[in-house]
């Protein structure tokens, strides 16, 4: 009964958010137009979703994955940007945070711990990974590329005790913008 009530509240909240957003958009005048010349534009695109499974343990896979990542530090980025004015030096300082893969870890979310609140015992971590220098190379051509940078990777243990890694292929995410300067650099990523 409580679960059914919770779902009804969630559905109501989603509906209310849609009404509020529609009302706000009806009264807001945008100075610039979205692609297509309209103040609001919907589009659809195909995303290549990758699912990998291995019999290696969750701990082995997460450790190996994390070993390939550097650690993003917002203070280092901010100091590099605010520094001497030498853009190449600033990019080098930011790039130095990357790990062997060229990526850095922005953060994690332990969804396994969250699922304990639902009475489930799972191992699942979502990783937020990227590289601000890579993001700069894309967003300078189309700011909308920042919707997908940094990227998300989910590593979890399934019911058969296999470890799974899932992510959306970056070239398909960034390819939607139709700009080869954005998509071409992502084809070597995973």
Per-range role (PLM):
Residues 1-3, 41:
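N-terminal hydrophobic targeting signals that begin at the initiator methionine
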Residues 27-190:
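Feature detects long, helix-prone N-terminal segments enriched in hydrophobes
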Residues 3-15:
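N-terminal Sec-pathway targeting helices
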Residues 13-23:
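Hydrophobic membrane-insertion alpha-helices, especially the h-region
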